Amino acid sequence: MLRRPAPALAPAARLLLAGLLCGGGVWAARVNKHKPWLEPTYHGIVTENDNTVLLDPPLIALDKDAPLRFAESFEVTVTKEGEICGFKIHGQNVPFDAVVVDKSTGEGVIRSKEKLDCELQKDYSFTIQAYDCGKGPDGTNVKKSHKATVHIQVNDVNEYAPVFKEKSYKATVIEGKQYDSILRVEAVDADCSPQFSQICSYEIITPDVPFTVDKDGYIKNTEKLNYGKEHQYKLTVTAYDCGKKRATEDVLVKISIKPTCTPGWQGWNNRIEYEPGTGALAVFPNIHLETCDEPVASVQATVELETSHIGKGCDRDTYSEKSLHRLCGAAAGTAELLPSPSGSLNWTMGLPTDNGHDSDQVFEFNGTQAVRIPDGVVSVSPKEPFTISVWMRHGPFGRKKETILCSSDKTDMNRHHYSLYVHGCRLIFLFRQDPSEEKKYRPAEFHWKLNQVCDEEWHHYVLNVEFPSVTLYVDGTSHEPFSVTEDYPLHPSKIETQLVVGACWQEFSGVENDNETEPVTVASAGGDLHMTQFFRGNLAGLTLRSGKLADKKVIDCLYTCKEGLDLQVLEDSGRGVQIQAHPSQLVLTLEGEDLGELDKAMQHISYLNSRQFPTPGIRRLKITSTIKCFNEATCISVPPVDGYVMVLQPEEPKISLSGVHHFARAASEFESSEGVFLFPELRIISTITREVEPEGDGAEDPTVQESLVSEEIVHDLDTCEVTVEGEELNHEQESLEVDMARLQQKGIEVSSSELGMTFTGVDTMASYEEVLHLLRYRNWHARSLLDRKFKLICSELNGRYISNEFKVEVNVIHTANPMEHANHMAAQPQFVHPEHRSFVDLSGHNLANPHPFAVVPSTATVVIVVCVSFLVFMIILGVFRIRAAHRRTMRDQDTGKENEMDWDDSALTITVNPMETYEDQHSSEEEEEEEEEEESEDGEEEDDITSAESESSEEEEGEQGDPQNATRQQQLEWDDSTLSY
């Protein structure tokens, strides 16, 4: 049977069928069964000022469920399987977010949520997961990828500049040395990266300095440094990091140059000025010992004050030797054999002495000079103890005997009774005993061998002789004789002795009697006398006291200096330091192990001069040191220190004497037992003149000058000398007297001569005032005396400071005898000598403390009354004539009136007192001054009579040629037939 074929389908139907078949297959394939996939590790970089992280590899999540490419255009809005919807970061405090950029491709980025700071945290690590969008429109069954690790590094930005660790740097280098590194400057950078946090270079900004700095900050010198050229360098240094950023603040570097380290004392001044009267002055206030870091076991330092050129070895009071003995407590009776030349003590007048009065009197003996001590100055008995004291400076002049003091026969035998002499470097004392019943050997010569005798330095020698014992003190230290020679006593004789200083006295006999020097002839009435064994050197303060030995306390007082070194160590300093002081106070020795404590002790050493008026000049200072080290092989040595103390010139006092210069006394007072006090109102003061700087800003103003201020001070006096001017004192009729009991209480001695009286001894100005107030002048023949003049001079420190010359003139008032003839007014005074001055100078005299009988004589009183009455009468007469002349109209009337006014003066007798005439002559200047004052006060009265006086004067001029007037003048002449002058 035949079948029929099926009919063909339309094209539209075919397309619909294919779509249905295909659509059913795709839907069947959209199942979300795969997880997204990420790389296991990511590395990222982010910059501080950016928020996007650059990852390697890029952040892309893959999903196998991704739709087909050709179907994407139909299903993009309805299909989610295979797309990536997000990323999730796991970790605490992770400042990053992961954001999907393209869901279909799974691309994403990581961004920072906040500003990153590399300095706080340089890198971060965390995990991240990707998740897809799930399936279906609701996004169910979301798949997550595995956790991938992300490492992010924060890149640095050069935001911080280098900063130096120190605000400044200091270093000390020794001159002349080349250093590889002196010091290191170091800067830091707060940036976190190696590029920006590292310092790549340093630079010295200061130009032209001999230093350089490397990249690590080490500074070194480019040449050897010189302390003399520059003590310190100041450098400015900057730093750069590796990003070429410069430090905002540069740093200052101070490099001090230290002299080449030499062990020694440092911090002392070469010159120290000492102001008199300021007490102790520290001489090394900042001294310290530099040991250059060498280990030292102990240090011994000796400080010495050199004063050998001042006075007799140092500064001492420069009073006379007798006054010094008294001040030191020595008993009275000291005889000064080499006194300062004065009126009564003049045997040293021809000896050369030192210049000036800053030091006491020093006598020079050149081998040809000597002085004989006058008889009666001192006597020595061999049976009594005695003391010889002397300052001596002697050099090594040879082997000849040189005599200091010698007592020998005046004539004939040339025997030496006692003698102190030098022989080489030996001091020898010869003391021969007087004749005695026992003729046996006895000690006669005592020998001392001393370096002090010939070292050309001043030394103090005291010889205490109490036979047979003789003790010698040199500078306060006792010395026993190394040899004693015995001899027989002297033979009996009645020959007088002669005491000589600087040689020995002997009569020339042709044989030199054990003398090794050529004798020098001295002219004498007794024959050819000679000096021998002359001394060459300097002597001062030679004294001899008989009857008592010198105490050790007195000897030390005489030798002790008024200046020296002092060390006052505080309780908290100077521990462990041993201190030794020399008795002379000129040497101090310090020893210790602790250098710090030794330095403190040295800083407290001071110079002190206790004199009110010290001797100005230089006192040299010297420090010598001895170092003991643990290792003697490398022990250091310390050079000596040389400096000086400059004692400034003290303000010189001006001693002023004031009082009554002129006065008169009756002759009876001069002849009385009390006499007349010469200085009843004497005043002694002393002043110094100081410069006072202006106050405020006056020192800056050149127009303001310093003012001088005079201040009164108090000090002692040692001499007051009263001398008579004109003829010397005649002790047979006049004398100067003083209360000796008061003098002994004051400790002031007095000596008198024909020239006057001298008071000596150290005492206050008030004491000298009191003593001089009691000085009296007596004259037993005052009726033949008109006046006497005296001069007073006081001084201090043996003539260093001298007062003004205070002169006093005393006049004698002579009183007439009332028992003479009644007409004594006309008699010639008996006390006026015609060959002498006929007047007594009373001008300017003050009648101090007048007595009832010291008045004008009665004769003179009558004469004065008569003269004054006559003068008043003549004045009244003159005034009357002037007024009458003014009223005259005719010459006849005038003549008549003149005749009426004539008076009979034939019986008038006038006696003139010579004393009054002399007073009038010398007081004319004072009267003229008084008249001028009266004329100025009475000017109006004078004006009233001026015209009358002028008319009267014209008329008187016209009357000069009138014979009648001549007759009248003859009538008015004085009757001086009985006038006495």
From Swiss-Prot:
One GO BP: regulation of cell growth
GO terms for MF: amyloid-beta binding; calcium ion binding; kinesin binding; X11-like protein binding
Ranges in the topological domain labelled Cytoplasmic: 881-981
UniProt GO cellular component terms: cell surface; endoplasmic reticulum membrane; extracellular region; glutamatergic synapse; Golgi membrane; neuron projection; nucleus; postsynaptic density
Record topological domains on the Extracellular side: 29-859
Record field: compositional bias (Acidic residues): 925-960
Posttranslational mods: Proteolytically processed under normal cellular conditions. A primary zeta-cleavage generates a large extracellular (soluble) N-terminal domain (sAlc) and a short C-terminal transmembrane fragment (CTF1). A secondary cleavage catalyzed by presenilin gamma-secretase within the transmembrane domain releases the beta-Alc-alpha chain in the extracellular milieu and produces an intracellular fragment (AlcICD). This processing is strongly suppressed in the tripartite complex formed with APBA2 and APP, which seems to prevent the association with PSEN1.
Annotated tissue distribution: Expressed in the brain and, a lower level, in the heart, skeletal muscle, kidney and placenta. Accumulates in dystrophic neurites around the amyloid core of Alzheimer disease senile plaques (at protein level).
Marked site positions, Cleavage: H824, M825, F853, A854
Protein name stated in the entry: Calsyntenin-1
Quaternary structure annotation from Swiss-Prot or TrEMBL: Directly interacts with APBA2. Forms a tripartite complex with APBA2 and APP. Interacts with KLC1.
Domain Cadherin: 38-164, 165-265
Region Disordered, annotated ranges: 915-981
InterPro entries per UniProt: Cadherin-like_dom, Cadherin-like_sf, CLSTN_C, ConA-like_dom_sf
UniProt KW keywords: Calcium, Cell adhesion, Cell membrane, Cell projection, Endoplasmic reticulum, Glycoprotein, Golgi apparatus, Membrane, Nucleus, Postsynaptic cell membrane, Repeat, Signal, Synapse, Transmembrane, Transmembrane helix
Species for this entry: Homo sapiens
Polar residues composition-biased segments: 962-981
Transmembrane segments: 860-880
Stated role: Postsynaptic adhesion molecule that binds to presynaptic neurexins to mediate both excitatory and inhibitory synapse formation. Promotes synapse development by acting as a cell adhesion molecule at the postsynaptic membrane, which associates with neurexin-alpha at the presynaptic membrane. Also functions as a cargo in axonal anterograde transport by acting as a molecular adapter that promotes KLC1 association with vesicles.
Sugar-modified residues: N346, N366, N515
Subcellular localization: Postsynaptic cell membrane; Endoplasmic reticulum membrane; Golgi apparatus membrane; Cell projection, Neuron projection
